[in-house]
């Protein structure tokens, strides 16, 4: 159990640091498009969860520490629904309602498509 907790913790730290770096880099380079960093990590996370889920379906003997460390830890730290929600509210409050609706649509539909694409990549 300690190895499992350590794997999830290490994955969470890595995913969180990558999200922090990505969103800060985007905000520094494109301050008007602050939401793009959250969108990027969420879409990449969706692609990766589909890919990892598909790989682990074909390799069910992969250690539980590896599966949990990557999916629960790393991807849980990388992706974020709360930041997505805050970004959407900020866009709406600044009067950018069409952009907020587009961002929400791209996030949800893009996330579903990215997850499907990741899973599909394991089926060839």
UniProtKB/Swiss-Prot annotation:
Transmembrane segments: 1-21, 37-57, 69-89, 99-119
Localization per record: Cell inner membrane
Regulation: Na(+) is not transported, but it plays an essential structural role and its presence is essential for fluoride channel function.
Origin: domain of life: Bacteria
Homology family: Belongs to the fluoride channel Fluc/FEX (TC 1.A.43) family.
InterPro entries: FluC
UniProt function note: Fluoride-specific ion channel. Important for reducing fluoride concentration in the cell, thus reducing its toxicity.
Protein name per its UniProtKB record: Fluoride-specific ion channel FluC
Matching Pfam families: CRCB
UniProt: Na(+) binding residues: 76, 79
Single Gene Ontology MF annotation: fluoride channel activity
GO-annotated biological processes: cellular detoxification of fluoride
Stored NCBIfam families: crcB, PRK14234.1
UniProt main location, coarse: membrane
The reaction(s) this protein catalyses: fluoride(in) = fluoride(out)
Gene Ontology cellular component terms for the protein in this record: plasma membrane
UniProtKB keywords: Cell inner membrane, Cell membrane, Ion channel, Ion transport, Membrane, Metal-binding, Sodium, Transmembrane, Transmembrane helix, Transport
Membrane association type: Multi-pass membrane protein
């Amino acid at each position: 159990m300690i190895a499992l907790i350590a794997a999830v913790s290490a994955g969470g730290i890595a995913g969180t640091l990558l999200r922090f770096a990505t969103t800060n880099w985007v905000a520094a380079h494109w301050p008007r498009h602050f939401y793009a960093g959250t969108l990027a990590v969420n879409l990449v996370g969706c692609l990766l969860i589909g890919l990892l889920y598909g790989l682990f379906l074909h390799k069910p003997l992969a250690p539980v520490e590896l599966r949990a460390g990557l999916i629960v830890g790393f991807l849980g730290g990388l992706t974020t629904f709360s930041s997505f929600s805050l970004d959407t509210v900020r866009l709406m409050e600044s009067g950018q309602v069409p952009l907020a609706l587009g961002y929400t649509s791209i996030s949800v539909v893009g996330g579903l498509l990215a997850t499907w694409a990741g899973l599909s990549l394991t089926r060839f």
